Amino acid sequence: MNRKLKDYTPTRFMAEGSTYNKAKADYAVSFIECLCHTKGIWAGKPFELIDWQERIIRDLFGTIKPNGYRQFNTAYIEIPKKQGKSELAAAVALLLCCGDGEERAEVYGCAADRQQASIVFEVAADMVRMCPALNKRVKILASQKRLIFYP
């Protein structure tokens, strides 16, 4: 299956002066699509974003303020059960940690309890293990629930 989002329209929540930067949005989408699914029937297959996921990524990473920084640095997204929340959250966390160009970037996951928070960490760690480029550059500290990226 090789489908691509055909009719993307930038977010209606763009602040005055902000613009849509297709190259930055394309980079974020491409980074995530280099990762692999870690669970279920899709395990080991490339993470091909479906339309609603791609719209979220393009809105968050392609909407740029006049100073060149992303307009959105916080997002609240509601996703129903069994719709790939953990996979998408892990992919975004890896993008922010390893692919955003920020030196010594820190990404934190929050949840109601430690076990719940560890779900996204475990998915991210598995994505790292399945991606040769990241596996060479990311140290997984499982006991601390920590990933360290070495550019």
Predicted regions and their residues:
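Phosphate/NTP-binding elements of NTP-utilizing enzymes
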Residues: M1-P151
